[in-house]
Amino acid sequence: MILTALSSAIALLVPIIILGAAWVLASRSTEDREKSSPFECGFDPKSTARIPFSTRFFLLAIIFIVFDIEIVLLMPLPTILHTSDVFTTVTTSVLFLMILLIGLIHEWKEGSLDWSS
């Protein structure tokens, strides 16, 4: 009982201490306009240092990563079919594919896969 209470207290205190230390170390003094502006050989910059980024491209990249991970998770299925219960493996894989298909249909209807607009 005492060991559980002690481990719970440690589990609560360690993240609080780490967050507190990060907050103290990350706090900055008053921001100076010159310090926060980009530096270009001592002169004012000719253009902005921030390049605009298309959020549609970012969303499409995230969708690609999700479906790429799907393929990685489906690759061992032929090997698993030989070593385990076929019904359980097929049921699990069909459920997995149905969830991903529902996600794909949702993305399609939402227009996230339409690059032209």
From Swiss-Prot:
Superkingdom as given in the UniProt entry: Eukaryota
Protein's UniProt keywords contain NAD: yes
Subcellular location: Mitochondrion membrane
Catalytic activity, reaction form: a ubiquinone + NADH + 5 H(+)(in) = a ubiquinol + NAD(+) + 4 H(+)(out)
GO cellular component: mitochondrial membrane; NADH dehydrogenase complex
Topology versus the membrane: Multi-pass membrane protein
Main location: mitochondrion
InterPro entries listed in its UniProt record: NADH_UbQ/plastoQ_OxRdtase_su3 (IPR000440), NDAH_ubi_oxred_su3_sf (IPR038430)
Entry EC number(s): 7.1.1.2
A GO molecular-function annotation: NADH dehydrogenase (ubiquinone) activity
Alphabetically ordered keywords of this record: Electron transport, Membrane, Mitochondrion, NAD, Respiratory chain, Translocase, Transmembrane, Transmembrane helix, Transport, Ubiquinone
Keyword Transport: yes
TM segment ranges: 5-25, 57-77, 86-106
Free-text function comment from the UniProt entry: Core subunit of the mitochondrial membrane respiratory chain NADH dehydrogenase (Complex I) that is believed to belong to the minimal assembly required for catalysis. Complex I functions in the transfer of electrons from NADH to the respiratory chain. The immediate electron acceptor for the enzyme is believed to be ubiquinone.
Family of the protein in this entry: Belongs to the complex I subunit 3 family.
The name this protein goes by in its record: NADH-ubiquinone oxidoreductase chain 3
Organism of provenance: Lumbricus terrestris
Taxonomic placement: Eukaryota, Metazoa, Spiralia, Lophotrochozoa, Annelida
Name of the gene: ND3
